Regions:
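Short, glycine-/small- and polar/acidic-enriched structural segments
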Residues: 1-76, 80-83, 100-106, 122-123
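Pocket-lining segment of extracytoplasmic ligand-binding domains
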Residues: 7-8, 82, 86-180
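Short, solvent-exposed polar/charged micro-motifs at secondary-structure junctions
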Residues: 32-34, 131-134, 206
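Flexible glycine/proline-enriched surface loops and loop-helix/loop-strand junctions
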Residues: 45-49, 142, 202-205
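Short aromatic/hydrophobic-glycine micro-motifs
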Residues: 73, 117-119, 187
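Short helix-coil transition/hinge motifs at the ends and kinks of transmembrane helices
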Residues: 75-76, 129-136, 190-194
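An extracytoplasmic/periplasmic, membrane-proximal ligand-sensing/linker region
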Residues: 113-114, 176-206
Length: 206
């Protein structure tokens, strides 16, 4: 059993010739357009601008390009997207006001906003995706399992799924207590960041 980004799950599905399957969706989009200014209020406002992002060749790039294209913006011609290797790099640039517009995931969005009050959340990928009227939500993370394992251990696997669902519900309902655990185990550096980031992190069990 593994908790993985959806694009990696699809790669493993193909590499194993279908030996793995998605058991649940655990994360919708955690991506946001943020800016140190007040110029972006719609996707159309990004035309002609430079936006910094991470995840070239992965979900952030594919999702961003799709949203742009569906809004009449050519990702190759109408906007300049500068890709960086790490979200921490973009976060540091935003904190120092070197960048005005960027695509960042949670909890980096919360961290940056807490350290620089000039940075604001301009757009949510979840909201922009839903505006397109597709039949599905934007998915970021999934629970992946080997089919053979699930078939050979149905009781244990179903127990895991039940406990995982309960854990998801608990975290969403008890953000302050969950934030303390998240900080203690080093998932996010500080509990106050986790408290603010959790409601924006699209943690689900579907």
């Amino acid at each position: 059993i593994a908790l993985l980004p959806c694009n990696l799950a699809s790669v493993l599905y193909n590499k194993t010739q279908g030996a793995v399957q998605v058991a649940a969706i655990n994360t919708l989009s955690v991506l946001y357009v943020v800016e140190s200014g007040d110029t972006v209020h719609s996707i159309q406002d990004l035309a002609g601008k430079t936006v910094y992002s991470t995840g070239k060749g992965t979900t952030p790039e594919f999702a961003f390009n799709y949203i742009l294209s569906q809004n009449g913006i050519d990702p190759q011609k109408d906007i300049t997207i500068e890709y960086k290797s790490e979200s921490t790099e973009i976060a540091a640039m935003l904190q120092n006001a070197e960048v005005t517009i960027a695509v960042l995931p949670q909890p980096y969005v919360t961290t940056v906003k807490m350290q620089n009050d000039k940075v604001r959340t301009a757009l949510s990928f979840n909201e922009e995706w839903d505006k397109l009227g597709t039949d599905s939500s934007m998915v970021t993370g999934v629970v992946l399992v080997r089919k053979a394992f699930a078939e050979e251990n149905p009781l244990a696997f179903n127990e895991f799924l039940d406990e995982y669902k309960a854990s998801t519900e608990y975290v969403n309902a008890n953000t302050e207590e969950a934030a303390e655990w998240i900080a203690e185990y080093g998932i996010v550096a500080k509990a106050p960041v986790a408290v603010k980031a959790l409601p924006e992190s699209s943690i689900v069990y579907i």
